[in-house]
Amino acid sequence: MTWRSLLIQNGGKLSLQRRQLLIQQNGESHTVPLEDIAVIIIENRETLITAPLLSALAEHGATLLTCDEQFLPCGQWLPYAQYHRQLKILKLQLNISEPLKKQLWQHIVRQKILNQAFVADETGNDLAAKRLRTLASEVRSGDTGNREAQAAALYFQALFGEKFTRNDNNAVNAALNYTYAVLRAAVARTLTLYGWLPALGLFHRSELNPFNLADDFIEPLRPLADLTVIHLYEQGRLKAELTPGIKQHLIKTLHYQISIERQHFSTLAAIDKMVSSFQAGVTDKNAKQLKLPEILPLKEYQYE
């Protein structure tokens, strides 16, 4: 199981040496086994990356993110055709019926709202948590009652104040956007490893979005990012610009402990479990087979 996430903040060169990632910076060299790497985030725009390394990362199922001038992830390198039965999965994906898509989306939205309720409880917003659990129980197939949007409005105002909106240009939204981007990349990576096309979503269907399916499956994980950010916010650690230390902290969301069916996993492992169960559910045409993560109090998963 891959478990490392790397943030490259200084210029230098990344290359392949004896099946390991070689990092050369400021006259020093470090190596990391490729089989340990899940995600690499390249923040420094002067970093050089060799083609053999990119090929080796793809072969090992690792994903690489590049960042824009605001140091937010803007591009992603994904493994291609790593699943041994690619055509089988493509046929499955193209033939998912509309009723099954709606049932799967119902489960996703319900778990997202339940996770939001947990975050509300963790932050002392008991009344909001109670209302969120009620909204979760009201989610219907396809979320025809739009309970997701109602929950979001209630949830964010409970966490960050009545005047807060996700469109505001502030430190909280910058931190949320950064963490969502990291989680989205991890979900997209796992989907491609299982042979799914990230562009073909269940609910998200924008023709301009190459990651619609990843945006479907990130939903129950968003509250994990929210809980991470609100802890930093309450501690007064969020500034107008995200510092290197804060980014390192936000990337830890990939390694926090979360639960699926009362078993504890790292976020990365839980994503794998979720995508694997999605495949089983689609194969058997049974949305109830989809296993979704439950948020726990923030604690790093202890790898064996």
From Swiss-Prot:
Known function: CRISPR (clustered regularly interspaced short palindromic repeat), is an adaptive immune system that provides protection against mobile genetic elements (viruses, transposable elements and conjugative plasmids). CRISPR clusters contain spacers, sequences complementary to antecedent mobile elements, and target invading nucleic acids. CRISPR clusters are transcribed and processed into CRISPR RNA (crRNA). Acts as a dsDNA endonuclease. Involved in the integration of spacer DNA into the CRISPR cassette.
Keyword Nuclease applies: yes
Organism (species): Neisseria meningitidis serogroup C (strain 8013)
Gene Ontology terms, MF aspect: DNA binding; DNA endonuclease activity; metal ion binding
Protein name, entry field: CRISPR-associated endonuclease Cas1
Keyword Metal-binding: yes
PANTHER family, sorted: CRISPR-ASSOCIATED ENDONUCLEASE CAS1 1
Tree of life domain: Bacteria
One family name in Pfam for this protein: Cas_Cas1
GO BP: defense response to virus; maintenance of CRISPR repeat elements
Subunit structure: Homodimer, forms a heterotetramer with a Cas2 homodimer.
Family, similarity comment: Belongs to the CRISPR-associated endonuclease Cas1 family.
Alphabetized InterPro entries for the sequence: Cas1, CRISPR-assoc_Cas1, CRISPR-assoc_Cas1_C, CRISPR-assoc_Cas1_NMENI
Gene3D superfamilies in UniProt: CRISPR-associated endonuclease Cas1, C-terminal domain
This protein's UniProt keywords: Antiviral defense, DNA-binding, Endonuclease, Hydrolase, Magnesium, Manganese, Metal-binding, Nuclease
Requisite cofactors: Mg(2+); Mn(2+)
Residues where Mn(2+) binds: E148, H204, E219
Disruption phenotype: No effect on CRISPR interference during plasmid transformation.
The enzyme's E.C. designation: 3.1.-.-
